[in-house]
């Protein structure tokens, strides 16, 4: 549970790997340590979270750019405030000028601008880790909400990737390699949000089409060579860019059009180039280390519902960041003029430097409290995402050996090209 974020225990048999610091609930076991110290799973997770916390989200660049000019601007405002009150203010002019200038310097809070994004990112990374979603950077957290297409590997990602030793080998492979729990629900939730789903597979069209229809995948690209997945990701990106260029003359963009990023979900060594090529790489935690090192997000439990959790986490994080930035900007835009005495001609009231100091401190406290609200965010698959797939969906199946597409009900084509990077 500590690693996967799931409440139910995981059964282990002889020869299975176990994770240090997890709890043995029943029975006895003899273990052999294969990774110690910084190489253990927990240490790697802690290091990954620490590295992610040290990164900056792209939205932070706006705050950094404003903060760069903020202090000089406040100094200029304070000097102008002092000069205006000395020359035009009521007696005692010097006292009023000093009070207002000092109040401006005290109430101004550049720290609020600097803290707005990092606070939300830090809490969000912790929330994700608690739910089995490990993001390697703040940028990944920001981008996940803009996913428009999710490309899945088949074996080990959508399916279990394990065949029972007592299996009937006369049966088709899709009857031996069963679909993972949660795969149908995850695909249905993505489709309910208007996100396109694609499956990349090296399997024959018959096998790939059957699995795709079972989980509700929109499009299948089958018979892909082991080193050809990155090519198909790049092709999807080119198609997206061409479509965006054609619609560039439009006057408005819908919410669906703003979701343009392509995510790749995979678990194997052959998925690593595609994970790196995709706008957002999502690795299955039960897969290879190479895949996880190439990805932007790792799903520790291997459950594809983690993709929905990632998108929900991104939405919650960006909403919280916008709230924090709105508060930071609003506080300074309102507080600085009040401290400068803009209300004095109407109310005869000047802000005390002590009250200004209290307001400055409380502004940062409010940011911390708002960021901590993320701890209560629900990032699980919700009822609004739609019901789980019924398995009656029709998928478009495209063979990597043919440039033509065929409906799943009429699958044609076989791999004939020897070049891994050509369709």
Segments the model singles out, each with a brief description of its role:
Residues 127, 195, 215, 238-259, ...:
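Membrane-embedded alpha-helical bundles of multi-pass transporters
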Residues 150-151, 220, 281-283, 298:
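Short, well-ordered beta-strand core segments
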